[in-house]
Amino acid sequence: VNLFLCQRLRGMLYYKSVRRQKPTQMSEFYGGLLLKNYFSLSMQPREINQISALGLAHCGDAVFELLVRSWLCDSGKLTTKQLHRATVSYVCAPAQAARADRMLPLLTEDELAQYKRGRNAHVHMIPKNATHEQYSKATGLECLFGALYLSGRLERINELFVLTMEEPHAD
């Protein structure tokens, strides 16, 4: 009975996954399931514009933190406690706002539009350690990184990240 249920469930998952999306270069079949590779997305601008600014910021927050963590691990031997504290100091809103200010002159017109979209988004809660202006700038930076990630522009994300990390972060 369990084998029958597993096969039936597998068939349902296969049917739903195939029905929902068409095979693309970033999809592959695995065990009868069509899997989408979320590490190499390449959304069109119209698809990205359908995502809310805060949704893009949510994604961009993870992208930025992963870059910071990778950068810190690559920069030398630190204890876990030191890595965590350094990560927190780089991903907090005041530090991200300072990076956003340094990044603005480097942005293209489309990138600036994504940044402003995030910066102007209405947020409901602002942390105590940041001003409204700092939090808005940080949200703009995260929105930009989210949009670049979802459009598959990883080289541009890395370029902007490296250029802003060259200078010391704000404490």
Residue ranges and their predicted role:
Residues 2:
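Non-catalytic nucleic-acid-binding interfaces of large nucleic-acid enzymes and RNP effectors
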